[in-house]
Design a protein with these regions (language model features):
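Strand-loop microenvironment adjacent to phosphate/nucleotide-handling motifs in alpha/beta enzyme folds
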Residues: 1-241
Length: 241
């Protein structure tokens, strides 16, 4: 009898993702404690040839949500796409391969020192912080062994804070389902210095309405949307090439 190996593989992947998510729950801060406010610079539309980045962050429920978002994004999106999914060492390579297979997009685990390209999707490596630098006219990924921040490594706040030092015209931020408030402080600080557009997943479609709630409570969201509508919003702001 021939077994359905694809179904077995999908089930194994799902079990791995659930295991990885359970590992980070205990280290995630409660979003209800969030009370900081930011003096945000209003978002402004920029030309299509501007320097852009898309950053998507997620925690609990993220792998499934990421598949939905990436499935709706074009292969020729006009920016590198950085993904921070809370996962420990050893899980993010499998997630990147799964997302690549399911969506047909160029998804990979970020490597230290690599140049970031438009239309490429980079997943932060589990057990490492991902930072972005600009070097000789290009954006590059830097993997860091700095201590966990708020119990998280990778941590979206660390990535967003690295962008404070980068010359960039626009950062499109999407905050998806997850416990805690990772991403809020980093985006908040970035919004005071850079041109950002912030999208949060709504409560109804979130597995855990923690991270999206925190960013919206901080008063720096441009849109709060059902999960299925987030890809079109990202594409509308970012454009294609």
């Amino acid at each position: 009898m021939i077994k359905n190996t694809k179904k077995i593989s999908d089930n194994n992947d799902s079990a791995l993702m659930r295991s990885a998510e359970s590992d980070i729950i205990e280290n995630t801060e409660d979003s209800k404690s969030f009370s900081v406010s930011y003096e945000r610079i209003p978002h402004k539309k920029v030309p299509s040839d501007s320097r852009k980045l898309v950053v998507i962050c997620a925690s609990t429920g993220g792998p499934k949500a990421l598949q939905t978002v990436l499935t709706g994004l074009p292969f020729n999106i006009n920016a590198p796409v950085i993904i921070v999914q809370h996962m420990p060492t050893g899980f993010t390579a499998s997630l990147a391969n799964r997302l690549k297979a399911k969506t047909g997009l160029r998804v990979k685990e970020a490597e230290d020192g690599e140049k970031l390209e438009k239309g490429q999707f980079y997943l932060a490596k589990g057990g490492k912080h991902l930072k972005i630098v600009r070097y000789r006219g290009s954006y590059k990924a830097v993997l860091s062994d700095d201590l966990p921040k708020n119990g998280l490594k990778p941590c979206a706040d660390v990535l967003f804070e690295s962008l404070l030092k980068v010359d960039i015209d626009e950062v499109v931020c999407a905050v998806l389902t997850g416990m805690g408030k990772d991403g809020t402080d980093g985006i908040g600080k970035l919004s005071e210095k850079k041109n950002v557009y912030v999208i949060a997943q709504d409560e109804k479609t979130s597995t855990v309405y923690g991270m999206p709630h925190a960013i919206d409570a901080a008063g720096i969201t441009d849109e709060v949307l059902p999960l299925e509508e987030i890809p079109k919003a990202i594409e509308r702001v970012t454009g294609t090439f």
